[in-house]
Amino acid sequence: MVQHLSAQEIIQYISDAKKSTPLKVYVNGHFENVTFPESFKVFGSEHSKVIFCEADEWKQFYQKNHSLITELEIEMDRRNSAIPLKDLTNTNARIEPGAFIREQAIIEDGAVVMMGATINIGAIVGEGTMIDMNATLGGRATTGKNVHVGAGAVLAGVIEPPSASPVVIEDNVLIGANAVILEGVRVGAGAIVAAGAIVTQDVPAGAVVAGTPAKVIKQTSEVQDSKREIVSALRKLNNE
């Protein structure tokens, strides 16, 4: 598995990060003699602009030039944000629209992250692993290879308190929809976590657990192969 960032490293990263309030500004007006700051990204025609900038920089510009503006609309989706979304340009995985993956998360080759899934800072999605719709991997949560994390499932994050141990999901594990894996829990290779289970203790390799709190109900050898199959075709990319 890929090496974890420690809680202290993540805390330091967040603490040191320049907090950002980016704006997208749609503005009409008389800008013939206006010089825009170099930090602005400005698009459009002479009288109609789309501007990307920081909120404090826009405030200064607006105070100086508001008399030239005839129409204005501002989009802001965060305030004093410390962690940007991850640049996925070189990520060799299938990432669907609406997934939220923060910087310093690791997405390994052939993984799949579905719509609405959230991958927090320091989390690791292993090779060939699928994170289904609206599932959440909290800070430092780790999955191994060929894991399926079902829709709405939660792998608890552990950044605060920093002493807590992260969730670790070993290879070839199936986690059902809306299951919750609490901090510090390790789920052994090949195990199955039933839908809706709340897992408070380690799960042995090859076990099937269900309930609240989750308990071992049988072994995966007793489960039909078709009910625990990982489908490689769903992880296929264009370059394969």
Swiss-Prot record:
Domain of life: Bacteria
InterPro entries attached to this UniProt entry: DapH, DapH_N, Hexapep, Hexapep_transf_CS, Trans_hexapeptide_repeat, Trimer_LpxA-like_sf
Keywords of the record: Acyltransferase, Amino-acid biosynthesis, Diaminopimelate biosynthesis, Lysine biosynthesis, Repeat, Transferase
Keyword Acyltransferase: yes
Enzyme class, spelled out: transferase
Pathway: Amino-acid biosynthesis; L-lysine biosynthesis via DAP pathway; LL-2,6-diaminopimelate from (S)-tetrahydrodipicolinate (acetylase route): step 1/3
A matching Pfam family: Hexapep_2
EC number: 2.3.1.89
GO terms assigned for molecular function: tetrahydrodipicolinate N-acetyltransferase activity
Catalytic reaction list: (S)-2,3,4,5-tetrahydrodipicolinate + acetyl-CoA + H2O = L-2-acetamido-6-oxoheptanedioate + CoA
Record carries keyword DNA repair: no
GO biological process per UniProt: diaminopimelate biosynthetic process; lysine biosynthetic process via diaminopimelate
HAMAP family found in the cross-reference section: DapH (MF_01691)
NCBIfam families referenced in this protein's UniProt entry, alphabetically: DapD_Ac (TIGR03532)
Family in the record: Belongs to the transferase hexapeptide repeat family. DapH subfamily.
Record's function text: Catalyzes the transfer of an acetyl group from acetyl-CoA to tetrahydrodipicolinate.
PANTHER family referenced in this protein's UniProt entry, alphabetically: 2,3,4,5-TETRAHYDROPYRIDINE-2,6-DICARBOXYLATE N-ACETYLTRANSFERASE, ACETYLTRANSFERASE
Protein name per the record: 2,3,4,5-tetrahydropyridine-2,6-dicarboxylate N-acetyltransferase
Organism expressing this protein natively: Staphylococcus epidermidis (strain ATCC 35984 / DSM 28319 / BCRC 17069 / CCUG 31568 / BM 3577 / RP62A)
